[in-house]
Amino acid sequence: MKFKAPAFLMALALTAPMALAAYADSPALPSAATADQVTTSKLVYGLLSDSRYAYRPRALDAATSKDVFKRYLESLDSSKQFFTQADITRFAPFEANIATAIRGGELEPAFQVFAVYKQRVGERVGYARKLLKTDFDFSTDEKFEYDRKDVPWAASSAELDDLWRKSVKNDWLRLKLAGKQPAEIRKTLDKRYATLEKSVNELKGEDVFQFFLNAYTSAVDPHTDYFTPRTAENFNQAMSLSLEGIGAQLQRQDDMVVIREVIAGGPAAVNGTLKPGDRIVGVGQGKSGPLEDVIGWRIDDVVAKIRGKSDTQVRLEFIPAEEGVDGKHHTLVLTRQKVRLAEQAAKGETLTIPAKDGEPARKVGVIKLPTFYQDFEGRRRNAADYASATRDVAKLLAGFKADKLDGVVLDLRNNGGGSLDEAIELTGLFIEQGPVVQVREPVAASPSTATAAKWSRGMARWPC
């Protein structure tokens, strides 16, 4: 089954593009928003409903409330695998009062809806795991529909049972066709379904608040998102291509956080002790003191403990990869430093296009730019070495110029966006001058135009 669980996967380094997971014995999910979340809800409503701040403010009327409600349900159960029509009917009063909930910060219904979702996930996973103890009949002709976005909600639990029976049967068949044996299939699927339930159980109140508030912001403007403080921190680190930590990418395997990669030049690499596959089981602050057992923790919670200000120390309790999960525990003290995430920066390579049909061979430079990154804080402080996509691309172009290439290709595939200023300035590396983007203010009589000019540092333009 293709699950759509709210999630955010941490690629850490203590870097981290978005994920979802938590303590094995996580505390009960809050039934209401915190005071800060209530205030935030009111502020976000004020910004998105005021023409001074929102380009196209949208009133929180019945139509918008219906849209927000739909988006919130989609963020939880987009494939309609957990809720029944009876659940949706039960939520109807919440849909009617969404405007009051957002304007006044009365967010309890959003948490109540999530509590039902969490309960339904537990029920469905329990049913799926029970099915794994039986045998499937593959002699009958049945159809399982993957794309359930436009189908109606299941009329009953019995209808969901049949959906999940077909889904589990389909999952089993796919593994069987891959050459897996029944015992291995049962083990694989049981773990898969248990992981789904665990990931939902580990969600916190701030996650639920983010899901709901983003249902509202996306209904008003599809390009507007609300970030929790931790998500905002991760975004800023991704844009600045740097972080303060030990310089290691982490991943979660079962209940343990494991070193996936040690980043060159970071404290962990300089120390040389940690290796890919090592399991982190405890974290402490400073040279001495208590160590917190982090087995079963959300990966982003472990990251938060390991990250910290430069020149401060963190202690890690870990099990070397070669010793297995029951191996001896070792302790390591590392001093945090600022680590540059060079692998996420612009990269260039030179390709040779062979001669063909009388045309001579050509040397072409290819620049891959994953994002229009910029260290916003570094630029604000006018730091000499702040991360900038434009600066890095300019250096690559200078190298290409010295090699006397015939042309340059700027590869923006998989580029997720980033700083608008960087996008405009980078364009100035390739054109003499001209409009790049128009920006229309909500109260302006006419749009203003952001214009690219030839970059002011003497870089020659290149065809693309």
Task: Please tell me what each predicted stretch does.
Residues 33-76, 87:
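N-terminal-proximal low-complexity accessory segments that begin disordered
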Residues 24-33, 51-61, 65, 198-205, ...:
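Cleft-lining beta-strand/loop regions that shape enzyme active-site pockets
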Residues 60-66, 70-146, 197-252, 313-315, ...:
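Extended, small/polar residue-biased N-terminal targeting/export presequences
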